[in-house]
Amino acid sequence: AAYRAGFDRLQTDAPVSRQIAEISMAAAHQCHRKWRELEWHLIGCYREGMDEFEMAEGLSYAMFPGSIPNFVDACGVWLNLIRDGRVEPGPAFRLWAETEGQGGFDEVS
């Protein structure tokens, strides 16, 4: 709660939109493998009504400084938020969440 309250205070009169601030922080936490904080900001993106394709694009930019494996893990965090019913996805991302066999190499063995 204190983290979100601090983030809210920082956003007062900020020169960037709340959506951009949320996805930027999500991408930064992805680079540092801070999965709980990533969840908070993905949920914040949904709360702000951000387009899911723009969210995916925002996270994809973090592949360069934060690595592809971190991006893949971040997508897993997002996928679990959808599957656990913690966010309400649009049709395309609901279909993504309902698609089986996305666990990496587990399905091969």
Task: Identify the function of each model-found stretch.
Residues 61, 66-69:
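Substrate/cofactor-recognition hotspot
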Residues 27, 58-62, 74-77:
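Short acidic/histidine-centered micro-motifs embedded in hydrophobic/aromatic stretches
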Residues 14, 31-35, 49, 69:
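Residues at alpha-helix boundaries and short interhelical turns
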Residues 1-20, 46-47, 71-109:
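Acidic, glycine/proline-rich low-complexity segments that act as flexible tails and inter-domain linkers
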Residues 20-35:
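Amphipathic, charged-and-aliphatic alpha-helical interface segments
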Residues 40-59:
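A cross-kingdom feature marking solvent-exposed beta-strand/loop segments within repeated
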